[in-house]
Amino acid sequence: MALTPADWQMIAKAALPNMGKYLEWRSLWREAAQAQARANAAALTPEQRDWTFDLLTGQRAYSAKPDKRYQWKVLPQGMSNSPTMCQLYVQKALLPVREQFPSLILLLYMDDILLCHKDLTMLQKAYPFLLKTLSQWGLQIATEKVQISDTGQFLGSVVSPDKIVPQKVEIRRDHLHTLNDFQKLLGDINWLRPFLKIPSAELRPLFSILEGDPHISSPRTLTLAANQALQKVEKALQNAQLQRIEDSQPFSLCVFKTAQLPTAVLWQNGPLLWIHPNVSPAKIIDWYPDAIAQLALKGLKAAITHFGQSPYLLIVPYTAAQVQTLAAASNDWAVLVTSFSGKIDNHYPKHPILQFAQNQSVVFPQITVRNPLKNGIVVYTDGSKTGIGAYVANGKVVSKQYNENSPQVVECLVVLEVLKTFLKPLNIVSDSYYVVNAVNLLEVAGVIKPSSRVANIFQQIQLVLLSRRSPVYITHVRAHSGLPGPMALGNDLADKATKVVAAALSSPVEAARNFHNNFHVTAETLRSRFSLTRKEARDIVTQCQSCCEFLPVPHVGINPRGIRPLQVWQMDVTHVSSFGKLQYLHVSIDTCSGIMFASPLTGEKASHVIQHCLEAWSAWGKPRLLKTDNGPAYTSQKFQQFCRQMDVTHLTGLPYNPQGQGIVERAHRTLKAYLIKQKRGTFEETVPRAPRVSVSLALFTLNFLNIDAHGHTAAERHCSEPDRPNEMVKWKNVLDNKWYGPDPILIRSRGAICVFPQNEDNPFWVPERLTRKIQTDQGNTNVPRLGDVQGVNNKERAALGDNVDISTPNDGDV
């Protein structure tokens, strides 16, 4: 019994532990597997053997044509035969004919076969051999469809000895009603475009009908411009023809500067194939030199596809010096120059057909230059989302209001105004890459995508550039760089002009709304900062689309708070999945001042908690008491030892009771809300969207911008002594039944007062009934002000504000 390859694999695996004999076993397995494969192949017929993929034998007889090494068994679902299998089968049947007549041109497309040769005698010999060979493969040719002539039809085109004429297409207008109807018609026209010399720009009104409602049954109408384009197609079809290529003669590729988009043709004493670019450009501004290079690359590929060789000559509308300049500035031209091994020229053939293609006047920049102009005036431009545009020339600032809310669009309008105002040599400095790149491309731009909102502005700038006589140089400068020098100063003047004008034109409500759109602060902050009414401030917050879903809800319960900063802190970890690896957000908050600190870290282990504590304490100070939940990182020995070393008292709340850390839990929600709101804000262009940067911006707003009812921010409450009532009281200690004071009041509550004895480290809470209020006068805390004192007659009664003395009350007075 012969061993199968699977058996030999089992033997090889069993021998793996013995590494010394591994190579020997591998060689034996290979030889046995090949022997078994040869034995199996011997039982196959020659036809079956040709279609078998022999992996183990190592033979490479069919490696040049990989498709022949596979046995096709599965047909596409729903088909009775496979077009691919049909092609492969007929190609294999035609192989003996190709080998017998190597000079014969034999083309196959599905069930159509074309035989071509210069000598009719050779065709007469090849045709009977073809019939005989196909009959051996079970294939028959319908003799009634055979055409033997110097002029024949193949794939709908008429092939004559010197030219190829496309099939005649009847264009009917009576059934053009829906998107589907126009799609079919334009598909036929696009298929015939290699026969037509109509530039793409002339057919644009026709192809623009396909835009709009995407449903195939959506209505469409034939516009006047589209009807005129359709008439041009009908006229071109009447005389459409291509020349037959002469294999012994070279051919060239010509790229013409037609309007808006270039047109190319493979040429050999006549058009061999017309090549057109895509009708709809991928970019808003299609730079004409790049479009020529892209079409030239497309033409080189078409030459290889149709004729099997590259043209010997490439003709473009540029001189040799201009080609070198474009190759250094454009990636497409660099690829074209390095990939084409032939000659590049700019002298077109003299032929009447080619006279149509010279109507694009400017194909190389003449007005926009690449180097600064020494004799040109320098103008700095800037635009803002408030619609204010400004430019600075010779120290003079000019501002203008536009009805736009995009900084790029406003700056485009400012540049247009500058080009119209300054007609002499001009240097423009802008802080928008978008505007600088657009202006550099517009002079020789082909098609400007009409769907863009700035298309109309770009067209106006292009017309102004084409009508100018003096050169223009435009460059970019980074805004808010803080660098010294006149360029940074000029840009800063233009930038400040947009803000000053916007502030002067806007009302306090509008200014508050813009400030809120940037930072999404609270209504109390807006009310204090911009002197608004409570209703106006609340309306701004409630009308904000980013803040309306985060409005506070009433809460119940209370957490113990510190009466001074750095007394009691709460700390916890929350998750922000959008931060990726830094999704573990550690948050700490001071329960007295409300100062908050957060660190996006890669985990929530004890080491990460310690890292967060050190970062927070280095920024805002070390608390006396730190309260957390019962998480494993907080209850670990490592963190407990860290707290002891740092002399921080660590407390944990009840297990599974997050309300014990309600202050930091609320801080989680507040911080996440600001991360979401400020992500939708106006800092997208200036602030990078990194996790730490986003957290820092939110903390800056919460700690330094939001204010309380007394007009203080969290940072101010944390870094300064809190406002205390200017009151001194004497108070009785119920433990020793003695009176103390006078001491200052820290906090008042219902029925109780918190006093801070001057000789104690901690404050005390005392019932309000056990206190006696003493009003101070110029720092004298021992002399209270009383309107009437025992022992003083009516004539000597003290007036309000007089200084009198009072003895310390005894126990009976209380």
Swiss-Prot record:
Zinc fingers (Integrase-type), renumbered ranges: 507-548
Keywords, comma-separated and alphabetical: DNA integration, DNA-binding, Endonuclease, Hydrolase, Magnesium, Metal-binding, Nuclease, Nucleotidyltransferase, RNA-directed DNA polymerase, Transferase, Transposable element, Viral genome integration, Virus entry into host cell, Zinc, Zinc-finger
Catalysed reaction, written as an equation: Endonucleolytic cleavage to 5'-phosphomonoester; DNA(n) + a 2'-deoxyribonucleoside 5'-triphosphate = DNA(n+1) + diphosphate
Molecular function GO labels: DNA binding; DNA-directed DNA polymerase activity; RNA stem-loop binding; RNA-directed DNA polymerase activity; RNA-DNA hybrid ribonuclease activity; zinc ion binding
Positions that bind Zn(2+): 516, 520, 544, 547
Keyword Ribonucleoprotein found: no
Occurrences of domain Integrase catalytic (ranges): 561-733
Record-level GO BP terms: DNA integration; establishment of integrated proviral latency; symbiont entry into host cell; viral genome integration into host DNA
Domain of life: Viruses
Enzyme Commission no: 2.7.7.49, 2.7.7.7, 3.1.26.4
Cofactor: Mg(2+)
Domain (Reverse transcriptase) ranges: 1-159
Binding site for Mg(2+) 2: 572, 629
Residues within the DNA-binding region(s): 727-776
Residue intervals of the RNase H type-1 domain: 373-503
Site feature location: Cleavage: 512-513
InterPro entries per record: DNA/RNA_pol_sf, Integrase-like_N, Integrase_C_dom_sf_retrovir, Integrase_C_retrovir, Integrase_cat-core, Integrase_Zn-bd_dom_N, Retrov_capsid_N, Rev_trsase/Diguanyl_cyclase
Cofactor: binding comment: The RT polymerase active site binds 2 magnesium ions.
Binding site for Mg(2+) 1: 382, 411, 431, 495
Transmembrane segments: none
Family, similarity comment: Belongs to the retroviral Pol polyprotein family.
Leftover remarks: Reverse transcriptase/ribonuclease HThe reverse transcriptase is an error-prone enzyme that lacks a proof-reading function. High mutations rate is a direct consequence of this characteristic. RT also displays frequent template switching leading to high recombination rate. Recombination mostly occurs between homologous regions of the two copackaged RNA genomes. If these two RNA molecules derive from different viral strains, reverse transcription will give rise to highly recombinated proviral DNAs.
Protein name (database record): Intracisternal A-particle Pol-related polyprotein
Species whose genome carries this gene: Mouse intracisternal a-particle IL3 (IAP-IL3)
